[in-house]
Amino acid sequence: MSVKHHVYLVPGFFGFTNLGELLYFGHAYEFLKQDLARRGIDAEVVTVVSHPTASIRQRTADLLKAVSETASGDDGPIHLVGHSTGGLDARLFVSPGAQVSEALELEPFARRVRTVVTVSAPHAGTPLATFFLGLFGQQLLKLLSLFTMYVLRFGRLPLSVVFRFGHLMARADDQLGWKATLLDQLFDQLLGDFSSERRDAVTKFLWDVGRDTSLIPQLTPEGIDLFNGGTHDRPGVRYGSVVTQARPPSLRTRLAAGLDPYAQLTHTIYAFVYGQTQRMPLTQLPLHTPAQTAALVQAYGAMPGPTACDGIVPTRSQVYGRVLAAVRADHLDAIGHFDQPAHQPPHVDWLISGSGFRRPQFEAMWKTIGDFLMEEEPPR
């Protein structure tokens, strides 16, 4: 009798998996499920619903709830794949002695975990979180969340919205003349295009983002230091990471975006978040093992510098355990949100980075993840 594997996809802080057709892991879920089936593996792949910006402990409790609801019927092995902050949730889940929920016991499930894979996760934090701590940053975080959901639902943001937002980003560093009413107007314009039912769901999601932002200070380089001090690897669990590095914004990347005004303006948004993320303090960069360093050098031709990032998380902050893949991609490319509308179902992108990441690289990356998950499974 074959052993049933339980694979959990854990979202980051854009974790809108509960909004109907707006699927955070849509393409990754379908590909991984089909890939495991092709291998003859009996596996259930589950996308986890978590509070988007709640604390890592609360998000890990959400993960525990999902696992208890779907993996209690047997004692099969459990595998955790976390994108962005979801990678930190996965690490806390298996940390010996972790206490995340008064209602559910963690240890019976944690001891069944065989692998933890983190994708573009901020193991050493990200300076972008420091920016999001401010009032302007908090409003911007909600708007970026809405942008992501809008693009996945409708394909593109209205050009008028992108133009106004791009103008705002050009002045964001000094914030002179910034008025909350402009962001409110952008919210209202975008929400008006959703159906009444979907608008209510999106509004609730955004309200949750604004109500509980406990996660944000935990993701700063200083905040993550405390997390790492209290979170430990579990013996017997295999840890692997997928690392992403995007091209820094430049004249070349602007030219690569072409003449499309939409691509040019959304590239402005990418340039802004990249500029915030690349401010990683040298003292906060983690030391890597020789094997990790060799993997990065082999993939990128040289060791990524301290400013290298995927637009959201510094590249060297993403390394944890075995480096399974190091790819040239932005933060959302890694989960299938890149520009390839001809594919069915289409891949849709709003963070135009000019990374060049497309379906072949996406499939190769997720196949590597599948290889790692089933590394100790006997061939069929």
Regions found by a protein language model. Give the residues of each.
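Lipid deacylating catalytic domains
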Residues: 1-380
